[in-house]
Amino acid sequence: MPQGDILIDDLKVGDLVLLKCYMNQLEDIDIDALLKMVELEDFKNQYVLGLSGGQKRRLSLLLTILNEPRLIFLDEPTTGMDLESVDNFWHLLEEQKFTSVVVTHDFNQIDHFFTKVLILKDGRIAAQESVEEIHRKGQTIEQFYREQVKMEG
Protein backbone atom coordinates (compact mmCIF):
# COMPACT_ATOMS: atom_id res chain seq x y z
CA MET A 1 0.00 0.00 0.00
CA PRO A 2 1.78 3.16 -1.13
CA GLN A 3 2.20 6.28 0.99
CA GLY A 4 0.50 8.37 -1.68
CA ASP A 5 -2.95 7.70 -3.06
CA ILE A 6 -3.33 5.79 -6.31
CA LEU A 7 -7.11 5.78 -6.40
CA ILE A 8 -9.38 6.60 -9.32
CA ASP A 9 -10.76 10.01 -8.35
CA ASP A 10 -13.49 10.00 -11.01
CA LEU A 11 -15.26 6.94 -9.60
CA LYS A 12 -17.67 6.79 -6.70
CA VAL A 13 -16.35 4.94 -3.66
CA GLY A 14 -18.82 2.06 -3.99
CA ASP A 15 -18.12 1.72 -7.71
CA LEU A 16 -14.37 1.55 -7.11
CA VAL A 17 -14.82 -1.23 -4.54
CA LEU A 18 -17.18 -3.05 -6.91
CA LEU A 19 -14.62 -2.70 -9.73
CA LYS A 20 -11.90 -4.14 -7.48
CA CYS A 21 -14.15 -7.08 -6.56
CA TYR A 22 -14.88 -7.68 -10.24
CA MET A 23 -11.17 -7.51 -11.14
CA ASN A 24 -10.39 -10.07 -8.43
CA GLN A 25 -13.30 -12.27 -9.51
CA LEU A 26 -14.90 -11.99 -6.08
CA GLU A 27 -18.58 -12.90 -6.16
CA ASP A 28 -21.47 -12.38 -3.74
CA ILE A 29 -19.67 -9.50 -2.07
CA ASP A 30 -21.59 -7.11 0.20
CA ILE A 31 -20.16 -3.71 -0.76
CA ASP A 32 -21.93 -2.03 2.17
CA ALA A 33 -20.35 -4.45 4.66
CA LEU A 34 -16.91 -3.90 3.12
CA LEU A 35 -17.28 -0.14 3.35
CA LYS A 36 -18.44 -0.44 6.94
CA MET A 37 -15.22 -2.33 7.79
CA VAL A 38 -13.26 0.83 6.96
CA GLU A 39 -15.86 3.33 8.19
CA LEU A 40 -16.78 4.51 4.70
CA GLU A 41 -20.37 3.27 4.51
CA ASP A 42 -21.68 6.86 4.39
CA PHE A 43 -19.44 7.66 1.39
CA LYS A 44 -20.55 4.90 -0.98
CA ASN A 45 -22.06 7.37 -3.47
CA GLN A 46 -19.40 10.06 -3.09
CA TYR A 47 -16.61 10.48 -5.59
CA VAL A 48 -13.17 9.39 -4.42
CA LEU A 49 -11.90 12.90 -5.24
CA GLY A 50 -14.04 14.29 -2.41
CA LEU A 51 -12.60 12.04 0.31
CA SER A 52 -10.22 13.32 2.96
CA GLY A 53 -6.67 11.99 3.15
CA GLY A 54 -7.52 9.61 6.00
CA GLN A 55 -10.60 8.33 4.18
CA LYS A 56 -8.49 7.65 1.10
CA ARG A 57 -5.99 5.72 3.24
CA ARG A 58 -8.79 3.54 4.62
CA LEU A 59 -10.15 2.96 1.12
CA SER A 60 -6.66 1.98 -0.04
CA LEU A 61 -6.44 -0.53 2.81
CA LEU A 62 -9.76 -2.06 1.81
CA LEU A 63 -8.66 -2.39 -1.82
CA THR A 64 -5.42 -3.99 -0.63
CA ILE A 65 -7.30 -6.48 1.56
CA LEU A 66 -9.47 -7.44 -1.43
CA ASN A 67 -6.29 -8.63 -3.18
CA GLU A 68 -6.01 -11.31 -0.47
CA PRO A 69 -2.24 -10.83 -0.14
CA ARG A 70 0.07 -12.93 2.02
CA LEU A 71 2.40 -9.98 2.60
CA ILE A 72 1.87 -6.24 2.36
CA PHE A 73 4.20 -3.28 2.66
CA LEU A 74 2.79 -0.12 4.23
CA ASP A 75 4.54 3.24 4.08
CA GLU A 76 3.24 5.60 6.79
CA PRO A 77 -0.27 4.14 6.32
CA THR A 78 -2.06 6.21 8.94
CA THR A 79 -0.99 9.62 7.67
CA GLY A 80 -3.96 11.98 7.72
CA MET A 81 -6.09 9.84 10.05
CA ASP A 82 -7.62 10.93 13.35
CA LEU A 83 -6.79 8.88 16.47
CA GLU A 84 -9.95 6.75 16.37
CA SER A 85 -9.38 5.91 12.70
CA VAL A 86 -5.76 4.98 13.46
CA ASP A 87 -6.90 2.53 16.15
CA ASN A 88 -9.55 1.06 13.86
CA PHE A 89 -7.03 0.79 11.01
CA TRP A 90 -4.57 -1.25 13.08
CA HIS A 91 -7.28 -3.44 14.59
CA LEU A 92 -8.64 -4.20 11.11
CA LEU A 93 -5.13 -5.04 9.96
CA GLU A 94 -4.65 -7.40 12.94
CA GLU A 95 -7.74 -9.36 11.84
CA GLN A 96 -6.25 -10.12 8.44
CA LYS A 97 -4.36 -13.28 7.54
CA PHE A 98 -1.25 -11.65 6.13
CA THR A 99 2.07 -10.30 7.30
CA SER A 100 2.58 -6.54 7.28
CA VAL A 101 5.87 -4.73 6.93
CA VAL A 102 5.34 -1.12 7.98
CA VAL A 103 7.50 1.96 7.61
CA THR A 104 6.60 4.46 10.31
CA HIS A 105 8.19 7.07 12.52
CA ASP A 106 5.36 6.99 15.06
CA PHE A 107 6.79 5.42 18.21
CA ASN A 108 3.37 5.29 19.90
CA GLN A 109 1.89 3.22 17.09
CA ILE A 110 4.87 0.86 17.18
CA ASP A 111 4.39 0.50 20.92
CA HIS A 112 0.72 -0.41 20.69
CA PHE A 113 0.29 -2.30 17.44
CA PHE A 114 3.57 -3.90 16.37
CA THR A 115 5.40 -7.05 17.42
CA LYS A 116 8.88 -6.41 16.05
CA VAL A 117 11.06 -3.38 15.31
CA LEU A 118 13.72 -3.22 12.60
CA ILE A 119 15.92 -0.18 12.20
CA LEU A 120 17.41 0.33 8.76
CA LYS A 121 20.55 2.31 8.00
CA ASP A 122 22.14 2.65 4.58
CA GLY A 123 19.91 -0.09 3.16
CA ARG A 124 20.70 -2.73 5.76
CA ILE A 125 19.20 -3.86 9.06
CA ALA A 126 21.11 -2.03 11.78
CA ALA A 127 19.05 -3.45 14.66
CA GLN A 128 16.05 -5.64 15.30
CA GLU A 129 14.16 -6.57 18.43
CA SER A 130 10.68 -7.60 19.51
CA VAL A 131 8.59 -4.89 21.12
CA GLU A 132 8.11 -7.23 24.06
CA GLU A 133 11.88 -7.60 24.57
CA ILE A 134 12.42 -3.84 24.33
CA HIS A 135 9.90 -3.33 27.13
CA ARG A 136 11.32 -6.23 29.15
CA LYS A 137 14.62 -4.33 29.15
CA GLY A 138 12.79 -1.30 30.56
CA GLN A 139 13.07 0.77 27.40
CA THR A 140 10.55 2.66 25.34
CA ILE A 141 10.57 2.27 21.57
CA GLU A 142 11.98 5.78 21.28
CA GLN A 143 14.82 4.98 23.71
CA PHE A 144 15.64 1.81 21.75
CA TYR A 145 15.66 3.78 18.50
CA ARG A 146 17.86 6.57 19.86
CA GLU A 147 20.28 4.05 21.39
CA GLN A 148 20.63 2.23 18.08
CA VAL A 149 21.08 5.43 16.09
CA LYS A 150 23.74 6.58 18.55
CA MET A 151 25.56 3.22 18.28
CA GLU A 152 25.43 3.33 14.48
CA GLY A 153 26.45 7.01 14.64
Over which residues does each language-model region extend?
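Q-loop/switch helix immediately C-terminal to the Walker
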Residues: 10-23
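Conserved ABC ATPase "signature" region
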Residues: 18, 28-43
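Conserved ABC ATPase signature
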Residues: 47-51
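Catalytic Walker B motif of ABC-type/P-loop ATPase nucleotide-binding domains
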Residues: 72-75
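Conserved H-loop
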Residues: 98-103
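A short, surface-exposed alpha-helical micro-motif characterized by mixed small hydrophobic
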Residues: 110-112
